[in-house]
Amino acid sequence: ETARLLQHWRNHAFSGIRPFFCQVEAVETAIWLTEVAPQLGNNGKRFLEHLDKANTEANPELSRLALKLATGAGKTTVMAMLIAWQAINAVRRPNSQKFTRGFLIVAPGLTIKDRLRVLMPNDTESYYANRELVPSDMLPDIAHARIVITNYHAFRLRERMDISKG
């Protein structure tokens, strides 16, 4: 599934905007770290241990990976490609621990949250179908993804105020 998606992103005759090279390379980096590096013995282990150490020092309960993209480079498209890669592999390889169908996307505000709705498979402007990010025969697999898009305010403690009667 991964190889097929990579071929699609590189070689498909897109009717509209094709993924930029930097978008494909960002996704390839995440794929390499997840699928290739663990199989490279000590060479891959070195990269993974470095990331594990940095994550443990920063926040031992949350593993993070950052992909650097310039302003306007299409981070939403990259998110859609990453979700597609993970969800399709999770559906087609249900016993694998490398892949997931569950995604939590935290936006910085309501405007961005609304723009990210294109990451929902059932949205009328879904990037998976409208931007042809997923081969048509794989689109039903994306429907199995569980995606929650919220904004960071949802995690703030709610304040209660007592208003005295009077």
Protein language model regions, located:
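RecA-like P-loop NTPase motor core of helicase/translocase proteins
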Residues: E1-G166
